[in-house]
Amino acid sequence: NSPIGVLWRLDDLDIPNPNHFAIAGTTGGPVSVINNKYLSNSDFFTGAFPAEYGNATAGVFDLRMRKGNDEQYEFSGQLGFLGTELFAEGPLRADKKSSFLVSYRYSTLQLFESFNIQIGTQAVPQYQDAAFKLHFPTKNGSISVFGIGGISNIDILVSDFESAEDLELYGDSDRDQYFGTSLAAGGVSYGHRLGSKAFGKLTLAYTWQDNHADHVLVNRDSSFAITSMVPNMGYFYRDQ
């Protein structure tokens, strides 16, 4: 078995790897795009999957977004190491019990950089993500519009260093590295009760994922001066 075979699912939609700085072909990453503030439930299966998870080979992470508060408005903000985030939810029309939910997060370290606050490295991880859900009850079911998305980039530039003493622990000492990922997933779903013992659901959705990496070799002479910079490796991966 392998973590590469894990299936991620959000509101019955199979989604790409929902992590920032994810490597193409993997299912994990250092910072999750998912925020637990808008989840109602999550199930993790390691084997003996139900038939609905037919494409899974190693594991399943099934996530459910909750609907927003349909009675009153709520707003919150948070500043933490993993991100600075804003969250809002509330009724669209109180008499109809419809609701909205929206979340946004921005890299705290990137925010520090914009204020010229040094964090100990010039390779600052830059990322942001957002999510939303609109919920509309109907006579025999409901309509939901939902989506998540995230963008992340990091540049490790050893060519900016003027001496060997300036080199950091991060990355390789002989090359500039550029790495980035982005993803989006969303859709519209309609659920309808078919009598007292049956329920049907139709979902129209779209998913998109993009990963790229580039390495540039930095050649120097004995005085640490740059003599040449040579593209060494690069890849671009897109799944939609």
What do the predicted segments below correspond to?
Residues 1-3, 11-13, 47, 66-68, ...:
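Solvent-exposed coil/turn segments that connect beta secondary-structure elements
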Residues 5, 30-76, 85:
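A beta-strand signature from Gram-negative outer-membrane beta-barrel systems
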Residues 13-44, 130:
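Short acidic/polar hinge/loop motifs at secondary-structure boundaries
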Residues 19-23, 112-117, 157, 214-216:
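Short acidic, glycine/proline-rich loop/turn micro-motifs
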Residues 29, 39, 56-58, 72, ...:
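Transmembrane beta-barrel architecture of outer-membrane proteins
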Residues 68-70, 84, 109-111, 116, ...:
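Sequence/structural signature of outer-membrane beta-barrel proteins
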Residues 80-106, 119-157, 178-206:
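Transmembrane beta-barrel wall of Gram-negative outer-membrane proteins
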